[in-house]
Curated annotation (Swiss-Prot):
Signal peptide: 1-21
Lipid addition sites, S-archaeol cysteine: 22
Organism: Pyrococcus abyssi (strain GE5 / Orsay)
S-S bonds: none
InterPro entries in the cross-refs: BMP_lipoprotein, Peripla_BP_I, PnrA-like
Keywords for this protein: Acetylation, Cell membrane, Lipoprotein, Membrane, Signal
Protein name per the record: Uncharacterized lipoprotein PYRAB04520
Recorded family membership: Belongs to the BMP lipoprotein family.
Membrane topology field: Lipid-anchor
Cellular component, GO annotation: plasma membrane
């Protein structure tokens, strides 16, 4: 779920932004050790998306600073350029690791990886479905973040005088099934802990790229009584943000929104007090660290709360993305510090201490492994879990553990 920006190109294929930092001032020494060299291959659109690509940049910059690696950033001109670019880089044998950001790299990687067994690849937020020694796929346990967001949304709904929460979701695909299960689980967990009933209105839009559809869907959910809407549709849910803003400013009622993946509070901090986090930056850093440490092992890795791979954004994260928005010319009426102050005030107003207590309790159960969420393998299994959760059967969503 991400918003695509303008793609830039050099040599007809890519934009290469070489981050120096690998050469200090002064004369080179003869004994200088060879640095690990990494290429970060952004999704189409590159930097400035205020989402996946910018988070990948954060993770790579952290690796450069903490691990001393050399980083190059590259953006394909289009989807058609992805495979040629990937093949070109693998052929060059210049890079210890190629990090591929986003699901659009899945098919190109499947076509290229077997040809270059000595080239290491890391695919972020997708999987080729094949286990290779030279490939690591890093996925996220979305249920864990969504469960916390379900608790938070439920608490905010009651502060707004209602008992209904909603979600504007993208396409009916497995990652969204996990979000749905987690979000509903969190709402029912809140219900069980407080005795306050919570109703969830979940709506698939069928798109990740249509703001008008997001706006219209959000308005329908607000008209049905939703007090808090969770955006799970990429660019589409930016329209949801606009709808919530209009709903409040037109005097039609009080409502709040929650973002997802990157910190999105900067977009309308008065109405978006919190965002769920999918830490692409952590995934990128971890992949690079495996190469540096010599702990590389091909296969699929999942990141959740325990690994700091998912969760919700703290105020430092809010400020970081507000600064990105400012750099991109999208934060025009306030400073990043003002965004943080507004968000802090809104969180204090709408997310009460008892709600944070429930969030932290659930968070600890997940981190410790006391409870583990199921990952549905079929749509039928997904639907069955949702039906059971709606009845209040929280254990239907769990692979391990139970909620009494």
């Amino acid at each position: 779920m991400r918003k695509l920006g303008l793609a830039l190109s050099i040599m007809g294929l890519l934009l290469v932004s070489i981050v120096a930092g690998c050469i200090g001032g002064g004369t080179e020494t003869k004994t200088e050790a060879k640095k690990v060299k990494v290429a970060i291959l952004f999704d189409v659109g590159g930097r400035g998306d205020l989402s996946f690509n910018d988070m990948a940049y954060l993770g790579a910059e952290r690796a450069k600073k903490e691990l001393g690696v050399e980083i190059e950033y590259m953006t394909p001109k289009s989807k058609e350029d992805m495979k040629p670019l990937l093949e070109q880089l693998a052929q060059s044998k210049e890079y210890d690791l190629l990090v591929l950001v986003g699901f659009l790299w899945t098919s190109p990687l499947n076509e290229v990886a077997d040809k270059y067994p000595d080239q290491k690849f890391a695919l972020i937020d997708s999987t080729t479905g094949k286990v290779r020694e030279n490939e690591v796929d890093i996925l996220f346990r979305e249920q864990e973040a969504a469960a916390l967001m379900g608790v938070i949304a439920s608490g905010m709904a009651y502060e707004l005088g209602g008992d209904t929460i909603g979600a504007v979701a993208g396409m009916d695909i497995p990652p969204l099934w996990k979000f749905h299960i987690g979000y509903l689980f969190g709402a029912k967990y809140f219900e069980k802990k407080t005795g306050k009933p919570v109703k969830l209105l979940w709506q698939y839009t069928g798109t990740f790229g249509d703001t008008q559809v997001g706006y219209n869907t959000a308005m329908q959910l607000l008209q049905q009584g939703a007090k808090v809407l969770y955006g799970l549709a990429g660019l589409t849910h930016v329209g949801m943000f606009d709808a919530v803003k209009d709903w409040n400013e037109q005097g039609r009622g009080k409502a709040l929104a929650m973002g997802q993946d990157a910190s999105q509070e900067w977009y309308a901090p008065k109405y978006i007090p919190i965002s769920g986090a999918k830490r692409v930056d952590v995934a990128v850093y971890d992949a690079i660290k495996m190469v540096v440490d010599g702990t590389w092992k091909g296969g699929i890795i999942t990141l959740g709360l325990k690994e700091n791979g998912v969760g919700y954004w703290d105020l430092d994260g809010v400020k970081q993305f507000a600064e990105f928005a400012k750099e991109a010319g999208k934060l025009k009426d306030m400073t990043p510090d003002e965004v943080v102050q507004i968000v802090k005030e809104q969180r204090e107003k709408y997310i009460k201490p008892y709600v944070w207590d429930i969030v932290h309790e659930l968070e600890e159960k997940i981190k410790s492994g006391e409870i583990v969420f199921k990952t549905p393998k079929t749509h039928e299994e997904y639907e069955q879990i949702i039906r059971e959760l709606e009845k209040g059967n929280l254990n239907a969503a769990l692979e391990k553990g139970s909620v009494e």
